């Protein structure tokens, strides 16, 4: 039997992960990016951009459930939701499961990403692009949040790492724009990397977000193919009570929602805000 090809992630110089490639579905390498989607027997379809895993069919539900249900159930009565990025459609899929949400706006810089993912990652969106509450806006995320006349109850930044095209979604200009179009008591969340290996990223986001929000923190989830430990999500709001809701309140909202999840549950929600000591110490050592 011929040996299978291997794809190696290149995010870190001294260590990393690899995947056996059963079948390459798409590969485009240009001067600007290297995008590949391949099939792997253990993780299903895998999408990687510039040598970094973006999503896999097997474990994407963890990331998307935690990015969606934590802020929406903490808010409790969100009507208008903004997704920045999220072209694969899985974040949209999870938001559409909240029946009390009235409008979902997704801002994607490249229309081609949406059509591409609908073709190659259909399980991610699971038909959610056809939800009547959904509106797609083709625009730069920073420009949109600083120019739109709309306001939102929850903003989810489904961004790539802060290198290349994703870098602008970690800037003060973006955070200030999000504060501008967030309703009073609203919640902003964003992926912030694996804090054990990308701690400076979390510290930088915390410092910048603290200029615009009175309550800034993080919550976490374990996502196998985001190599290196626990994934960190930024959390920012002006209502500090939302990060400390009782488990009874979260449980009641969860039951009322009718959600059936594979990772998220009310106990996980509460526990996710418990941060490791090394991250607490790093945040505490920053100048006020």
Swiss-Prot record:
Write the record's keywords in alphabetical order, separated by commas: Cytoplasm, Polyamine biosynthesis, Spermidine biosynthesis, Transferase
Q: Name one GO molecular function term.
A: spermidine synthase activity
Q: Which residues form the active site?
A: 158 (proton acceptor)
Note the HAMAP family from the entry.
Spermidine_synth
Judging by the UniProt lineage, the source's domain of life is Bacteria
Q: Which pathway is it part of? A: Amine and polyamine biosynthesis; spermidine biosynthesis; spermidine from putrescine: step 1/1
- Catalysed transformations (reactions): S-adenosyl 3-(methylsulfanyl)propylamine + putrescine = S-methyl-5'-thioadenosine + spermidine + H(+)
The EC code for this enzyme is 2.5.1.16
Name of the gene this protein is made from: speE
Any idea which positions bind S-methyl-5'-thioadenosine?
33, 108, 140-141, 165
Q: Where does the PABS domain lie?
A: 9-238
Instruction: Give the UniProt subcellular location, in the record's own words.
Output: Cytoplasm
* Listed GO CC annotations: cytosol
| Annotated GO biological process | spermidine biosynthetic process
Q: How does it assemble?
A: Homodimer or homotetramer.
From the Swiss-Prot or TrEMBL record, give the protein name.
Answer: Polyamine aminopropyltransferase
Annotated positions binding spermidine: 64, 88, 158-161
What organism does this protein naturally occur in?
A: Escherichia fergusonii (strain ATCC 35469 / DSM 13698 / CCUG 18766 / IAM 14443 / JCM 21226 / LMG 7866 / NBRC 102419 / NCTC 12128 / CDC 0568-73)
Q: What does this protein do?
A: Catalyzes the irreversible transfer of a propylamine group from the amino donor S-adenosylmethioninamine (decarboxy-AdoMet) to putrescine (1,4-diaminobutane) to yield spermidine.
Record's family? Answer: Belongs to the spermidine/spermine synthase family.
Top enzyme class of this protein? transferase
The uppermost taxa in this organism's lineage are: Bacteria, Pseudomonadati, Pseudomonadota, Gammaproteobacteria, Enterobacterales
Q: Which Gene3D superfamilies match?
A: Spermidine synthase, tetramerisation domain, Vaccinia Virus protein VP39
Task: Tell me if Cytoplasm is a UniProt keyword of this record.
Answer: yes
């Amino acid at each position: 039997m011929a040996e299978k090809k291997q794809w190696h992630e290149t995010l870190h110089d001294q260590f990393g992960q690899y995947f056996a490639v059963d079948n390459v579905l798409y590969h485009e390498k240009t001067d600007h990016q290297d995008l590949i989607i391949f099939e792997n027997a253990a993780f299903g379809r895998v999408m990687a951009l510039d040598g970094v895993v973006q999503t896999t069919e097997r474990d994407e539900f963890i990331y998307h459930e935690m990015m969606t249900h934590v802020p929406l159930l903490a808010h409790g009565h969100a009507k208008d939701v903004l997704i920045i990025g999220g072209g694969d459609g899985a974040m949209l899929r999870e938001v559409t499961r909240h029946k009390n949400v009235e409008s979902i706006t997704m801002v994607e810089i490249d229309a081609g990403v949406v059509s591409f993912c609908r073709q190659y990652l259909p399980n991610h969106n699971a038909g959610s692009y056809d939800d009547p509450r959904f509106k797609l806006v083709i625009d730069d995320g920073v420009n949109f949040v600083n120019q739109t006349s709309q306001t939102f109850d929850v903003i989810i930044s489904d961004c790539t790492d802060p290198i290349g095209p994703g870098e602008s979604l970690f800037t003060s200009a973006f955070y200030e724009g999000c504060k501008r179009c967030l309703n009073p008591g609203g919640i902003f969340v964003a992926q912030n990397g694996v804090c054990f290996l990308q701690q400076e990223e979390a510290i930088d986001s915390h410092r910048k977000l603290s200029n615009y929000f009175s309550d800034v923190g993080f919550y976490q989830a374990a996502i196998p193919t985001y190599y290196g430990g626990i994934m960190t999500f930024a959390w920012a709001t002006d209502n500090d009570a939302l990060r400390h809701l009782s488990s009874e309140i979260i449980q009641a909202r969860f039951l009322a929602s009718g959600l059936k999840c594979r990772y998220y549950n009310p106990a996980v929600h509460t526990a996710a805000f418990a941060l490791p000591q090394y991250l607490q110490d790093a945040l505490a050592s920053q100048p006020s």
